[in-house]
Amino acid sequence: MLLTSSSPCESALATRYFRLDACLSSRYEVLDGRFTGEPVLPLCYGAGKVEHAESWAFREGIDLSRSYFYTDSNTDLPMLLRVGRPRVVNPDLRLRWEARRRGWTVLDWSRPDGALGLDDDASPQD
C-alpha cells in the first residue's frame, strides 16, 4: 500500500508500476473535469496521513499496531508513531536523531552495491 502526499495522478502510476494493492494520496477538487488546485482536506500529509491510514485500516480490518511504515522524512513522524513497526530509510538528520532516540530501525538503501544496511545504533523491534 502506498501512503503519499502526492496527487492521485502521480500516485496511481506508482501504484500500478509497483503492483501495490492500494494507494491513499492527497486529493484535489475537480470542477467541470479540471483540477481547481484546491485541496480536499485532510491532505495525506503529517497528521492527515494518519487520518487517511486509520480510515483505510478500519475499512480493511488492518491492525496498524502490527503494521510497518517506511519513510525518509520527519514530516511522517505522526505516522511512524502510529504503527507498531516503524522503519526509517535514508533519513534526514532530524529523523535519524528521532529514530535513534526511539530505538527504531534505520535502513540505508543508498549503498552502491544495492545491499540493505542497518544503522549501528538501531535494532529491529520485531
Give the predicted meaning of each segment.
Residues 1-126:
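C-terminal cap/substrate-recognition subdomain and adjoining C-terminal extension
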